[in-house]
Amino acid sequence: MKRSVTLGAAALLLLSLAGCSAGADTHSTPSASGAPGPSALANAKGVTEISFWHGLGGINAQALQSLIDEFNTENAGKIKVDTSAQGSYADLLAKYTASLRDKSTPTVTLSNDISSGFLYDVKRSVSPEAMAAANPGDLKLDQLAPAGKRYYSVDDKLVAVPMNMSTPLLFVNTGLLEKAGVETSSLKTLDGLAAAATKIKDATGVPGIAEAFDDWWFEQLTATSGNLYCTPENGRGTKSADKVSFQKPSQVKAFSTMAGIYKAGAGLDVGTDNNNAVTAFAAGKTAMMFNSSAVAASVANSTTFPYVALPFPLSAPTSKAGTVVGGSAMWLSNQATPAQQVAGWKLISFLASPASQAKFSEATGYVPANTALENSTARKDYLASHPVAQVAIDEVKNVSDVPASHGCFTGAFSAIRAAMIPQMQAAFSGSKSMEQALADATTAANQAISDYKTQLAGD
């Protein structure tokens, strides 16, 4: 599962930022007033056509298109959605960036979690809170999952509507654990996981765990150790992020615990792609793996042995630590006509509705962003036969509302990840000390943020 935006795309984003923002150091939430209401669409002549861009592929794209086809059928003669699948999130952002220059941004953009800072900074979106207030017959924001709302909020104001969520899980080959005499109850903490990984390797010869060198996992290790990933306030207050925070003692300890597993030979190197971890796990080449809940279907389709999924282990109390959600969210363009904005909001409301969320979640494995479907009998029946989905939902539902679990919000995220990954690879291989790796990553990431903010300010 690819999360990162490529360096080439990140550079393209920077080139187009100048002049997009009035200030690079403070946040300015989209206006919560003046949003168009139902009359804007009702008074429009003919069919209101809107554009919808996304970066999903495979079964996820198919499930999304099925919902959009349903929306078009229900709104025939009034609204028509023209969908454009961009192939990947990197391609989506590259095309979106080009559209900024000629003011042709799509009516609705569905983009991934780490692009949120950039999409917010370019100020081409309409406030979801304003649209909900002006269109009370559509989406009820209080139905959205709190963890999703927090991730897509700045200064306590919602800036995009979550479409789908993922959460980090620990997948476990129960047969290999039994051979090694390891109880799953010992895997609730990071220290317990490390001890189990070594014990499994010693007892069975199979590596205890696989973790892809995707920076999402270092963000999770940070949040579950009770620390911020960027400052101030993870970039979510009135001031935007100006530095990373990679060197807090409990954070370094969490990183070092995972690195210790690898240096002891109890971890399997699967590179940077989480899909490689799925392949290794299904082949019995690792007893455990960290992976996104979004791979649940792939794991189910490729494994032939009993396994379970467990919540991501913590290394700090829940009073200050928790996991960070991933996924994607929908952004409504402020460059669209009032009729298009209302039509776009109706599409967003439809896709985020309980019925649509149930269909999309069950087709893809993503955690639904709408909590109103939880009491549905059909949904309860589905979860009873899909325990991994239940574990993922429970983790998202129960995550503590603390600053660490909100995640870092910055338009420089892709560059930060590019700075962090090679340093962690060096630390995990033992070619560089953890302290030096984090110092080097900090220097590079802080420079990336500085460069981004300079471009954003138009200097």
Language model region names:
Residues 70, 74-144, 179-181, 280, ...:
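Extracytoplasmic "Venus flytrap"/periplasmic binding protein-like
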Residues 1-50, 73, 446-459:
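Short, low-complexity disordered leader/linker segments with a strong preference
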Residues 129-144, 186, 228-253, 301-302, ...:
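Short, solvent-exposed loop/beta-turn-alpha elements that line the ligand-binding surface or hinge
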Residues 46, 180, 256, 260-266, ...:
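Extracytoplasmic/periplasmic substrate-recognition and gating elements
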Residues 390-444:
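C-terminal capping/gating helix-and-loop segments adjacent to ligand/active sites or protein-protein/ligand interfaces
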Residues 154-155, 159-163, 168, 191-243, ...:
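Extracytoplasmic/periplasmic solute-binding protein
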Residues 113-168, 221-224, 309-310:
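Hinge/lid segment of periplasmic solute-binding proteins
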Residues 197, 240-270:
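Glycine-centered hinge/linker elements that transmit conformational signals in sensory
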